[in-house]
Amino acid sequence: MADKRDYYEVLGVPKDADDAAIKKAYRQLAKKYHPDMNPGDKEAEIKFKEASEAYAVLSDAEKRRQYDQFGHAAFEGGAGGAGAGGFDFDFGDMGDIFGDLFGGMFGGGGSRRNSNGPRRGADVRVNVRITFDESVRGTTKKIDVTLKDECSSCHGTGAKPGTSPETCSKCGGRGQVTFTQQSFLGMVRSQQPCPDCHGTGKIIKEKCPDCYGTGYISSKKTIEVNIPAGIDNGQCVRIQGKGEPGVNGGPRGDLLVAVIISASTEFERDGYNIFSNVVISYPTAVLGGEIKVKTVDGEVLYEVKPGTASGTRVRLKGKGMPSVRNAAQRGDHYITLIVDIPTKLNQEQKDALMAYEKALTGNERHGKKKGLFGK
């Protein structure tokens, strides 16, 4: 056992790696070294077996505990079992992994799924565009969406009226077929959807002429969607039970309406906070004064402090977007005050500025005073 590599080293994970990290590492190695991906490559086959052996131990809590305590010696007894290292492989979890990677070749996970039982219908996703103002106040939109409904002629069976689907003879109505095959890891028991009935367990000899054997009829429907105030760009409104119909008596899926918000020319949004720029005159910046500020709720008055510098940011508490979960809770509105420096002056204005310049002391003229109104 001295030449056997450390299992953590084989998978490239630290000794304190959690189950998710171990599984992720094994998936990557399994995909890289699987013999079907490397036909005739003996080295790849060896590495694949090595990774599979390591995963079989480290993915099992009890085996991992024994390995952490005794190393490879924990499995020296009883060598020659079905799996490498003297213990049996449990292909339940590996079947899920291989099924994800190689289309169900190894099965195992399928044994835990009843493909012929009730299944929830698929969700349907559509987009709806609204204005920025509508996102602030909430709105109602009507959207057209194509949905499937049970065929009224065959009542969802897919069979011609007066006939019924027959039980699939290949799978006995189970929707899955089971087979055992010899692999480089030993005998592997696999399950796959039945190729004859495609996992339904039923065979339709005479198809319904209205739905062509699908059991469903597609039609366009108009659905009213209530979009709450405060919704953000890309968020979805979920309408339960308005998606695709379920299978074998399962519930319908949901309709997911993704909201696309047109950009505002005046405001920017970050979460529930609103940002905008407000231009103020040079005299207002120097002397202070009341200005009007446009918010998502309309204009409000704000008192500019004397000596305000350009770029000063001001917070208007509670003037931002409403919370989509509680309209009474709101974000804030942050305004950045931009001082407008005039570039074209008439003679009277120039004379006034020249008089102001002459009235400044030496320190003020060279910018050494702390403030315009400091003493």
UniProtKB/Swiss-Prot annotation:
CXXCXGXG motif repeats lie at residues 151-158, 168-175, 194-201, 208-215. Binds 2 Zn(2+) ions per monomer. InterPro entries: DnaJ, DnaJ_C, DnaJ_domain, DnaJ_domain_CS, HSP40/DnaJ_pept-bd, HSP_DnaJ_Cys-rich_dom, HSP_DnaJ_Cys-rich_dom_sf, J_dom_sf. A zinc finger (CR-type) spans 138-220. Zn(2+) 2 binds at residues 168, 171, 194, 197. The keyword Nucleus does not apply. Keywords: Chaperone, Cytoplasm, DNA replication, Metal-binding, Repeat, Stress response, Zinc, Zinc-finger. One of its GO terms (cellular component) is cytoplasm. Pfam families: DnaJ, DnaJ_C, DnaJ_CXXCXGXG. PROSITE patterns: DNAJ_1 (PS00636), DNAJ_2 (PS50076), ZF_CR (PS51188). It comes from the Bacteria. It is found in: Cytoplasm. Its cofactor is Zn(2+). Belongs to the DnaJ family. Participates actively in the response to hyperosmotic and heat shock by preventing the aggregation of stress-denatured proteins and by disaggregating proteins, also in an autonomous, DnaK-independent fashion. Unfolded proteins bind initially to DnaJ; upon interaction with the DnaJ-bound protein, DnaK hydrolyzes its bound ATP, resulting in the formation of a stable complex. GrpE releases ADP from DnaK; ATP binding to DnaK triggers the release of the substrate protein, thus completing the reaction cycle. The J domain is necessary and sufficient to stimulate DnaK ATPase activity. Zinc center 1 plays an important role in the autonomous, DnaK-independent chaperone activity of DnaJ. Zinc center 2 is essential for interaction with DnaK and for DnaJ activity. HAMAP family: DnaJ. This is Chaperone protein DnaJ. It comes from Lachnospira eligens (strain ATCC 27750 / DSM 3376 / VPI C15-48 / C15-B4) (Eubacterium eligens).
